[in-house]
Amino acid sequence: MAAPTSLIINSAFTEPQQHWAENADRTLRLEPARRPAGYEIIDTRENTRRQVPIPLVDTIRERVRQWRADGWPGTTAVTLALLQHWRDADKVSRRQYPFYFCQLEAIETLIWHLEALPEYRQGIHIQGDGGEFERLCNKMATGSGKTTVMAMIITWQVLNALTYPKSPRKYSSAVFLVAPGLTVKARLQVLLPGHPENYYDLFELCPSEALRSKLNRAQVLIENWHALMPLKEPERSVVRKGQESDEAFARRVLGSLAVCKNLVVINDEAHHAYRKPADVKLSKAEAEAMGIDLDEATRWVEGLDRIHKMRSIARCYDLSATPFAPTGRSNTEAGLFEWVVSDFGLNDAIEAGLVKTPRVVV
């Protein structure tokens, strides 16, 4: 076929129905189905690239699709009210900022994992990262609205925690948000319910004034990942206090949240936070060439481990456009986080018109 004049072929507000596929000669053809979940590995040394499928995500997509069609069986009354409010066709048409399909699918997948009836989750095992607390990851392209998904996670968790305080599902009204830098931390302040430009009001996340009022009781702490670094003793200190204890660390990092237990953690740009496998032998120079800060990655997770030890992390939600970590198989290869449960990548975002598209030369 002739080269396309536009790469945008899907609506941002409905599930993708088609995608561009690449022929052997690098030309494009239109496939009449949603793009299977996957990612691309590029070897710059060999000038090659290959597609790696994520079959687990494809299976989860189908389960979530069926669960949605059946009316989300198993959800609490609060969760059902939220899902109906977010999906309501009449409300969507009059919303100033309607939700993208990828945002709804991301939050639905997290809810499905915790609340769907067992038959909708039967046979599905999500591999963790080897740590003691559960992690789930939404793979979402930059520009697809990750911050809104974080606001939806907080709304869902907090309202359920306050409504069902004895629920065995361990919802939490205490949320610890970890940002990859000070600029992002400043941008995430809109996730504080009392912020004048908060996302809960901007995106009309609560179906009633009563629930919106209840949401104000959320305890949300937003910190830069550097807060998770061990405390260094001043070099000129006369009195040697010794290494900071785990309890002192938890109190210092969590501040007002230090009185809480069973926290929910949200990692923004979570590709900065992973456990370095023992078989990964990377020098600092090699890591830098891959765009990896090994110290940041390990310190980030080590800090969360210490918090889990003292306060317990009910679950951890990771959001990232590039949730990859070194595999140890080669210096140029990175592997996908094994706890990715949804995928809306850069190509999907381009085809839905959510990010700027490269100019197509005809």
Predicted features, each with a name:
Residues 1-362:
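RecA-like P-loop NTPase motor core of helicase/translocase proteins
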